[in-house]
Amino acid sequence: MFRKIIYPLVSGFCLQLSLSGADLLKPYTGPSVPGVDTSTLTGKVMAGYQGWFNCEGDGADLGWTHWSRHKDQTFGPGNVTVDLWPDVSEYDPDELYETGFRFEDGAAAKVFSSYNKKTVLRHFAWMRDYGIDGAFVQRFANGLRDPTKKAHKDEVLSHAREGANRNGRAYAVMYDLSGLPKGGTKLVETDWRELRDKMQITNDPAYLNHKGKPVVTVWGIGFMDGGKPRAYTLKECYELVRFLKADGCTVMLGVPTGWRTLDRDCAKDPLMHEI
């Protein structure tokens, strides 16, 4: 059972003709079926949905991102970043992309793209079939500075929203701050306003709430990388959490393992506990 859902959940989707940003960032008006209780996080089994795999020819113009070490070169022998090969036996032909790998009979090995709408909807259908309540759709904040990468993230989120609604699942936004420069948390504030105002994401029936408020997760607060603090500061993170809470959100954090004792991979700063 799990071999068919765990690895592909880090994907997204594809449309041969991508929607424009204006079409993506609008309220959802499609079908929505009842399913899991989206009013609470309590008791939920949620997956993390990275949506970061791309394939040459998928329409995203991001090459072989996260499949290959060099995204502008074919995903094949000597150009690999993944540890596992996905089970693609249930995908349709229009969801698969030829790689540089070959089977013994000479046939090309194929993988999925996170830019394929059909694939994202399939993943949420699998969640329904196998008892996964929903997904935290990750938005890697550092990529919000790049229009091409942001367009990809918007498309993944748009189709995850549709997949959740069509399959009675829950979804929520998870921001990953990794790689942000100093001052970069302002990108998250701007992005959240856009999702709230243009997509009206917090009014969506499939969006996860907790204690009467929409859930937003912020991952990457207080980490030390190689013994050094990250470029974006704890003070910035503090202000970001304050912003989200003032906007009426329930805020969930992703923090280092040493957060309680302020050691190991965690910044030795009491502001961590205030956050």
Regions found by a protein language model. Name each.
Residues 22-275:
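Glycan-processing catalytic domains of CAZymes
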Residues 7-18:
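Bacterial N-terminal signal peptides
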Residues 1-4:
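Positively charged n-region of N-terminal signal peptides that target proteins for export
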